[in-house]
């Protein structure tokens, strides 16, 4: 297990602390991985597309442009992430099916939950920088999250204690 406060203390000049509080919705309270990004407004087609690819050691960062009326992921899309070995999903937006998500072996952080699903028009962009919580989340940089908060690191995987696990 790792601790974001310990990582922040050890790597002060290498990590950027996110200043936006997130809620945990998956069963994994801590996760980390190399970032892949998707930006989409009221359409999660690209989210589903990228989570259908190999995600071993990766975290998907979803920029929903902070829409509050629709959820970027639910239980079906989260299952796709699990099936493709994603470490976690970080949603700058909302999720749904929270009672099912909490039982799933996946790290999921989001701002909150809502009941409505998005449109399905295959709109969105992959690989764009996401600016959220005072931090630039870039494709192929790293994200570390636990109950304490979340940190981003530019392009360098941190050395974790020997008892750390994804």
What do these predicted regions represent?
Residues 142-143, 149-150:
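C-terminal binding/interaction regions
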Residues 1-138:
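Feature captures the catalytic cores and cofactor-binding loops of soluble hydro-lyases/lyases
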Residues 94, 145-146:
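A short, compositionally biased micro-patch
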